[in-house]
Amino acid sequence: MVRLLISTGEVSGDLQGSLLIQALQREVERRSLPLELMALGGPRMQASGAELLADTAPMGAIGLWEALPLVLPTLRLQSRVDHVLKQRPPDAVVLIDYMGANVRLGHKLRRWFPRVPIIYYIAPQEWAWRFGDGGTTQLLSFTDRILAIFPVEAEFYAQRGAKVTWVGHPLLDTVSVLPDRQLARERLGLKSGQRLLLLLPASRQQELRYLMPTLAKAAALLQQRDPSLEVIVPAGLASFETSLQKALEAAAVRGRVLSAQQADELKPMLYAAADLALGKSGTVNMELALRGVPQVVGYKVSRITAFVARHFLRFRVDHISPVNLLLKERLVPELLQDEFTAEALVQAAIPLLEDPAQRHEMLEGYWRLRQTLGVPGVTDRAAKEILDLTKP
């Protein structure tokens, strides 16, 4: 019997965790090895077969101010999880993204279980941030192996002494077969010639507050220009659905909010049918790129967090979208903090909706990006590495 603990947070981490769990189940079946999976994650990981010790999907926040409401819930959650892990120690630990919480957990588990391998899959993007090497040093102090999803990530951590395996980007396993665009448009009820705009605002509660009103206002302005424009907003979590609907109504947008369940079921159809997406920075940018959807990216945090990051932490980053970070160019328009306005979103969106040359340029850049990400079979390679490192 092998007992694994997988820890992640937020909507994107829950998705990646569920894909890894499915790959682990395939690999243990091949090895005829009994497997017990414990998880800090979300409903997708639970549905894939893990025992959910705590639901961390709603717990993500970026910024000091934004994280304050989560302090007490997080402490209560940690206390419950600590009790379980002391009663049922894992044979290996897999950390997925979710930097702050997973770094704290990694340090704790290294103290408690010195011989248990700790594997970081989808490690923090230290290679992209100009913060110095303090965070990297912390991460390497408790990590036995990093399973890197980007070549630049693998090189960065290897140069600093980590044991690294580059497995490729896990989204490659989910986009190998795309639905037919015309069939997808018919399934979504789109008329001939009608454009589809996706709004993708949030995998964290704070992002609903800071991003969605501006995205909705931009959608309303675009509908003034093209009254037939269809707007769809897929909910990342069921708890987001009401807030998303209210934001559309407040901006007088004619559009639909898809429930979290509908969003999961229809995601390939949405991407196949979409003409443009406006949304937050993060994993979704990579998914849009791999599915060939032109996009405009924005992000905003509280003024307090922005001030602290700029003036005290000296936070600097060349790009906020992973697409641009990997290509080392501004292929995807980015609007950060005060630049993130409805008018600026519209100005960036119009060429992508109306100029075929602009669309072609972005799609060509997506193709170049795709060549750097490896080949499908990513989660199977990650599962094999994890089990090879695990000693029951």
Swiss-Prot record:
Coiled-coil ranges per UniProt: none
Q: Which reaction does it catalyse?
A: a lipid X + a UDP-2-N,3-O-bis[(3R)-3-hydroxyacyl]-alpha-D-glucosamine = a lipid A disaccharide + UDP + H(+)
**Quick one: a GO cellular component term?**
membrane
Gene Ontology biological process terms from the UniProt entry:
lipid A biosynthetic process
EC main group: transferase
Is this entry keyworded NAD?
Answer: no
Q: Domain of life here?
A: Bacteria
Q: Which Gene3D superfamilies match?
A: Glycogen Phosphorylase B (3.40.50.2000)
Q: Name one GO molecular function term.
A: lipid-A-disaccharide synthase activity
Q: In which pathway does it act?
A: Bacterial outer membrane biogenesis; LPS lipid A biosynthesis
Q: Does the keyword Metal-binding apply?
A: no
Protein family: Belongs to the LpxB family.
Identification of the protein by name: Lipid-A-disaccharide synthase
**Which organism encodes this protein?**
Prochlorococcus marinus (strain MIT 9303)
Annotated gene: lpxB
